[in-house]
Amino acid sequence: MANPIYILAHANAEYLPLESGNSILLPKAYDIVWSLIPFLIILFVFWKFVLPKFQEVLTEREDRIKGGIQRAEAAQAEAKAALEKYNAQLAEARTEAAEIREQARERGKQIEVEMKAKAEEESNRIIEAGTKQLMAQREQVVNELRREMGQNSINLAEHLLGDQLSDDVKRSGTIDRFLADLDTVAPNGK
């Protein structure tokens, strides 16, 4: 097999890359031009199509992030406002509950006073009715006792005198005198 380097070295010497002033680091002008044209085409396509899409995606992401932050801030502000509203309603409800408790306490005291007054009034009425009933019963008992005592005194007088007191006038006069004597003996007997 033939060595390619040997063939290149013995062939036409003016076309060898390392001879006749060709440099690896500095290519020929036609190589630079033909390399620069595709580079510029790729750069133009990149600049015209890829970079705007990339910018659009970046802008969209940035807007989404900013929007997310703004929504989060808005949600946080809304939550804070809702919390303040809730705390205000809670404080108002506590105040209202305290007022209701105080009104109930006052109403309870008022009802207690009214019930005591009604009970006292009812008690006084019952006592008065009882007193009247006792007085009526006392009068009835006193009248019955007077009748019985009058009858007993007549019977006793008839028995002692041995005379019958059949005359109604005599009998009522005797009874009246006896009861009058009895009333003078016990004037405070009521």
Swiss-Prot record:
InterPro entries in the record: ATP_synth_B-like_membr_sf (IPR028987), ATP_synth_b/b'su_bac/chlpt (IPR002146), ATP_synth_F0_bsu_bac (IPR005864), ATP_synthase_B_chain (IPR050059)
Subcellular location(s) of the protein: Cell membrane
Residues forming coiled coils: none
Membrane topology of this protein: Single-pass membrane protein
One Pfam family matching this protein: ATP-synt_B
Domain of life assignment: Bacteria
Entry GO MF terms: proton-transporting ATP synthase activity, rotational mechanism; proton-transporting ATPase activity, rotational mechanism
Gene Ontology cellular-component annotations: plasma membrane; proton-transporting ATP synthase complex
Transmembrane segments: 32-52
Keyword line: ATP synthesis, Cell membrane, CF(0), Hydrogen ion transport, Ion transport, Membrane, Transmembrane, Transmembrane helix, Transport
NCBIfam families in the record: ATP_synt_b, PRK05759.1-3
Role: F(1)F(0) ATP synthase produces ATP from ADP in the presence of a proton or sodium gradient. F-type ATPases consist of two structural domains, F(1) containing the extramembraneous catalytic core and F(0) containing the membrane proton channel, linked together by a central stalk and a peripheral stalk. During catalysis, ATP synthesis in the catalytic domain of F(1) is coupled via a rotary mechanism of the central stalk subunits to proton translocation. Component of the F(0) channel, it forms part of the peripheral stalk, linking F(1) to F(0).
Subunit structure: F-type ATPases have 2 components, F(1) - the catalytic core - and F(0) - the membrane proton channel. F(1) has five subunits: alpha(3), beta(3), gamma(1), delta(1), epsilon(1). F(0) has three main subunits: a(1), b(2) and c(10-14). The alpha and beta chains form an alternating ring which encloses part of the gamma chain. F(1) is attached to F(0) by a central stalk formed by the gamma and epsilon chains, while a peripheral stalk is formed by the delta and b chains.
Family: Belongs to the ATPase B chain family.
Entry protein name: ATP synthase subunit b
